[in-house]
UniProtKB/Swiss-Prot annotation:
It comes from Caldanaerobacter subterraneus subsp. tengcongensis (strain DSM 15242 / JCM 11007 / NBRC 100824 / MB4). S-adenosyl-L-methionine binds at residues 33-35, 52, 78, 99, 106. The keyword Magnesium does not apply. GO terms for molecular function: rRNA (cytosine-N4-)-methyltransferase activity. Residues 288-308 are annotated as: Disordered. One of its GO terms (cellular component) is cytoplasm. Belongs to the methyltransferase superfamily. RsmH family. HAMAP family: 16SrRNA_methyltr_H. Its EC number is 2.1.1.199. The gene is rsmH. This is Ribosomal RNA small subunit methyltransferase H. The keyword S-adenosyl-L-methionine applies. It is an enzyme of class 2 (transferase).
């Protein structure tokens, strides 16, 4: 299948990266290669390090970007940025981009099991070599663990009922497909609550996907590592798709911009100096036109910071 992925907030992201044609840039979430391609168009002697956990994403992007010789492809998790750069003998970079969440390609590729709209095996792994999948979460987690995941990562108010219904249902046999899970969720959520708002399974599927791929785990640490490897005046641009991710990015940036731990109103004695300047005081949102053209962009937010 061709890797189709509309890059979200493309123009805004590239503009805010302030690309230096001779600089070194990192795309930590290569995906379909849309953002990478725009960065490469602006480089002369510079280079791009393109990272993704998904082997298929890398293969598809290599095809798309085959005319560019200044790309280094790395199959890894962007959280290992320091180790990745160390292995390449690179100390500092001029800009980093992260486009978090699942790509439209992964959603479209039915057998990956990311979508609640199509029947597929319960999988949801971004890295297909990982031994842990959605099947394990749904069939092996205790009711309490399921409730925690669905409440915490899905912000789902019916989490306890959904967890209870999953555990009841699996007594009859393993839950193996996305459509089985969707039916259980529909039964768990009262009909009156299902009439309005998004698809009833949306939040639970998001929660399980985040758990399977550990999407929020160590994200704050990874952001701090990325800021550390930025050169002065280098920028980091992060696109998020739900409030949990956005909160982590916002709070990490705030902490790095104002790390002082002294009581307000007293002179600073802790010696902690600001590391970044936040460029986007409020997140940049997609235009009305972009949302109409690409509904997936509706919940996207872009935050940008510059290394001091």
């Amino acid at each position: 299948m061709e890797y189709v992925h509309k890059s979200v907030l493309l123009k805004e992201t590239i503009e805010h990266l302030n690309i230096n044609p001779e600089g070194i840039y990192v795309d930590g979430t290569l995906g379909g290669g849309g953002h990478s391609e725009e960065i490469l168009k602006r480089l002369t002697t510079g280079k791009l390090i393109a990272i993704d956990r998904d082997e298929e994403a890398i293969l598809a992007a290599k095809e798309r970007l085959k005319d560019y010789k200044n790309v280094i492809y790395i199959k890894d998790n962007f959280k290992n940025i320091k180790e990745i750069l160390r292995n390449l003998g690179i100390e500092k970079v001029d800009g980093i981009l992260l486009d978090l969440g699942v790509s439209s390609y992964q959603l479209e590729e039915v057998e990956r099991g990311f979508s609640y709209m199509k029947d597929a095996p319960l999988d949801m792994r971004m890295d297909k070599t990982s031994p842990f999948s959605a099947y394990d979460v749904v069939n092996r987690y205790s009711e309490k663990e399921l409730e925690r995941v669905i409440r915490e990562y899905g912000e789902e108010k019916w989490a306890s009922r959904i967890a209870k219904f999953i555990v009841e249902e699996r007594k009859k046999g393993d839950i193996k497909t996305t459509s089985q899970l969707v039916e259980i969720i529909k039964k768990a959520i009262p009909a009156s609550a299902r009439r309005t708002g998004p698809h009833p399974a949306k939040r639970t599927f998001q929660a399980i996907r985040i758990e399977v791929n550990e999407e929020l785990k160590d994200l704050d640490r990874a952001l701090e590592d990325m800021v550390e490897v930025l050169r002065g005046k280098g920028r980091i641009a992060v696109i998020t798709f739900h409030s949990l991710e956005d909160r982590i990015v916002k709070n990490t940036f705030k902490k790095l911009e104002n790390p002082c731990t002294c009581p307000p109103g007293l002179p600073c004695t802790c010696g902690k100096q600001p590391v970044i300047k936040i460029i986007t005081k409020k997140p940049i949102l997609p235009s009305k036109e972009e949302v109409e053209e690409n509904p997936r962009s509706r919940s996207a937010k872009l935050r940008v910071a510059e290394k001091l």
